[in-house]
A protein has these predicted regions:
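A substrate-binding/cap region within the structured catalytic cores of diverse enzymes
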Residues: 78, 82-83, 88, 95-212
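Histidine-anchored nucleotide/phosphate-binding helix
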Residues: 66-76
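Bacterial N-terminal signal peptides that target proteins for export
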Residues: 1-9
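C-terminal regions of proteins
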Residues: 134, 199-209, 216, 223-266
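Sec-dependent N-terminal signal peptides
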Residues: 8-16
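Short hydrophobic beta-strand that contains or immediately precedes a catalytic carboxylate
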Residues: 53-56, 216-219
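Solvent-exposed loop/turn segments at secondary-structure junctions
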Residues: 58-61, 89-93, 150-154, 221-225, ...
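N- or domain-start disorder-to-order transition segments that initiate the globular core
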Residues: 13-14, 21-50
């Protein structure tokens, strides 16, 4: 049984490597500092050289989720990937994640639905969208790390009426505009919602700093921008590469990110 399990794990790892090498890079990657496109080889070399990599997604686009899987596989093929940090998992769930990962490391097997059950996956983040990325990490033995607040922490912060001081002064104004544009009736709760955003970014920065390197953080776009999110909470001098997924024609300032990864809107 042990030999059979080890053989299954080896096949998973080989499949992961083959998939990354067989699939071309989706979309186009632009270096925001120079305005020049990067080919697949240049992109992977740049990303693989970063000890802390932040990837900002649109939560509801299948193309973004496919790009995340492609990048994780390509990075792990280039060099061993230390950790995958996800906004979609609360950090309080780390003991459970570690138990499941130790169980898998012993050669046990869990398919998609079984892995979802073992992790007690948060249904607010559709497994159909993120399950593939989680399964890829599990199959490759990459440490899976939760980066978000618990629901209890969120609820407590939402009741806050004290303004928070963001690391970047303009962040409050930028995030306030986004929140009010998306939730027209949110003005009475604005301080609480910004407190949640601030605390989430601080938590993800802490987790990303402590995670085995090289570490990849997958989070919403506003969480990874230098002007509004996680980078401002990292220890001073911490090198980090910021990649933002975007649609054709979208603009992102070079002060917010290093690379713009342009995909379709699917």
């Amino acid at each position: 049984m042990w030999r059979s399990s080890r053989r299954w794990l080896l096949l998973c790892l080989l499949a992961l490597t083959s998939l990354a090498s067989a699939q071309p890079m989706p979309g186009t990657v632009i270096d925001l500092a120079s305005g020049q496109p990067l080919d697949e080889s240049m992109f992977i070399q740049r990303a693989a050289g970063a000890q802390r990599l932040l990837l900002g997604e649109r939560h509801d686009l299948a193309g973004d989720h496919a790009a995340q899987r492609w990048l994780l596989q390509a990075l792990h093929q280039q060099r061993p990937q230390g950790a995958l940090v996800m906004e979609m998992i609360a950090s309080e769930r780390q003991p459970r994640l570690q138990r499941v990962q130790r169980w898998l490391a012993k050669g046990n097997h869990a398919d998609g639905s079984r892995l979802q059950e073992l992790l007690d996956w948060d249904a607010r983040w559709p497994w159909a969208a993120y399950g593939g990325l989680v399964q890829d990490a599990a199959a490759a033995g990459i440490a899976l790390v939760g980066g978000n607040l618990s629901l209890a922490e969120v609820n407590r912060l939402l009741a806050s009426t004290e303004p928070v001081a963001f690391p970047v002064a303009a962040a409050r104004q930028r995030l306030s505009a986004v929140v009010l544009a998306q939730h027209a009736d949110a003005a009475p709760m604005l301080d609480g919602m910004l407190a949640v955003q601030f605390a989430r970014d601080r938590r993800m920065a802490q987790v990303l700093t402590d995670a085995p390197a090289p570490a990849l953080l997958v989070a919403g776009r506003w969480h990874v921008l230098r002007g509004t999110g996680v980078p401002g909470h990292l220890p001073p001098g911490t090198p980090a590469l910021v990649i933002v997924l975007a649609s054709p024609g979208e603009q992102v300032d070079a002060s917010d990110a290093d690379l713009l990864w342009v995909l379709g809107d699917d």
